[in-house]
Amino acid sequence: MFLTLIAAIISFMVSAFTMPYFIKFYQLKKIGGQQMHEDVKQHLAKAGTPTMGGTVFLLVATAVSLLVSLFSIKNTQSLALISGILSIVVIYGIIGFLDDFLKIFKQINEGLTAKQKLALQLAGGLMFYFLHVSPSGISSINVFGYQLSLGIFYLFFVLFWVVGFSNAVNLTDGIDGLASISVVISLVTYGVIAYVQSQFDVLLLIGAMIGALLGFFCFNHKPAKVFMGDVGSLALGAMLAAISIALRQEWTLLIIGIVYVLETSSVMLQVSYFKYTKKKYGEGRRIFRMTPFHHHLELGGLSGKGKKWSEWQVDAFLWGVGSLASLLVLAILYVF
């Protein structure tokens, strides 16, 4: 526990100290910044804001985790666990970095195409499974204490879980500070679970990432001076999925990650309903003012027809939802 606290403090200090230099470098080199969605007019002023800040906090968290773990790793099993989680973080971070690089440095608005990104994510998921999950012999899902054996189909579950939540966190990263603190809330919850399970190696990784994210948040809260980019959001989503698998509490991510699930579901529902109504009535109709869900809240509150919410209001609401959901999971696991 002491080493986890040390890792968190070091990560916070290095991340908070390094980020201004990253932002200044970005501005001095006059690198193109984040593109804004024209439908949310209050976001247009953010155009050109430095992005790819996730590069900094990922490097910091990874380096600190490896450094501090040298004093805590006692066996090869612990080393395999740490390397497994860090590997998926690095792989998905590289995918996100490539996507950001194409958008910003090569001026390719789309970045990686959807098919290219999915192919790379699946390849990363396969590497994670065959190098770190399969050797452990895990082939079942723990659902409320019951082991649901999937056999070879556990491979498809892992791919769905990692790819799905990496994209879900990516969708959540749409307004200042939302994704960074939402992930911190999720990581704190998994930190409690790891502590109860005496999985101190996982706890150390969690602590390092929490510290690095809080250092990043010092510059990502409204008005944001930097965004994490796909390099950060894709890696964070994959990390949450990997941690839920490592702790054998996969189902909990559906509740702990309720904000990411809500954001993704809103997009899927909107697209499906629009296509259905266009085919049936000749015109596409919408359920939400705009998706992902945080934009719906910005444009008209919960109903979509009320007063516009500020980014701080949206943040507070969704952070609150995530916190309550996380407390519910802890209550289910350790109280009821």
Curated annotation (Swiss-Prot):
GO cellular component entries: plasma membrane
Domain of life: Bacteria
Catalytic activity: UDP-N-acetyl-alpha-D-muramoyl-L-alanyl-gamma-D-glutamyl-L-lysyl-D-alanyl-D-alanine + di-trans,octa-cis-undecaprenyl phosphate = Mur2Ac(oyl-L-Ala-gamma-D-Glu-L-Lys-D-Ala-D-Ala)-di-trans,octa-cis-undecaprenyl diphosphate + UMP
Keywords from the UniProt entry: Cell cycle, Cell division, Cell membrane, Cell shape, Cell wall biogenesis/degradation, Magnesium, Membrane, Metal-binding, Peptidoglycan synthesis, Transferase, Transmembrane, Transmembrane helix
CDD domains: GT_MraY (cd06852)
EC number(s) on file: 2.7.8.13
Residue ranges crossing the lipid bilayer per the database entry: 3-23, 53-73, 78-98, 118-138, 143-163, 174-194, 200-220, 226-246, 251-271, 316-336
Keyword flag Acetylation: no
Enzyme's top EC category: transferase
Topological category with respect to the lipid bilayer: Multi-pass membrane protein
Molecular functions per Gene Ontology: metal ion binding; phospho-N-acetylmuramoyl-pentapeptide-transferase activity
Cofactor(s) needed: Mg(2+)
GO BP annotations, alphabetical order: cell division; cell wall organization; peptidoglycan biosynthetic process; regulation of cell shape
Pathway: Cell wall biogenesis; peptidoglycan biosynthesis
Protein's cellular compartments: Cell membrane
Function, as annotated: Catalyzes the initial step of the lipid cycle reactions in the biosynthesis of the cell wall peptidoglycan: transfers peptidoglycan precursor phospho-MurNAc-pentapeptide from UDP-MurNAc-pentapeptide onto the lipid carrier undecaprenyl phosphate, yielding undecaprenyl-pyrophosphoryl-MurNAc-pentapeptide, known as lipid I.
Family under the similarity heading: Belongs to the glycosyltransferase 4 family. MraY subfamily.
Record protein name field: Phospho-N-acetylmuramoyl-pentapeptide-transferase
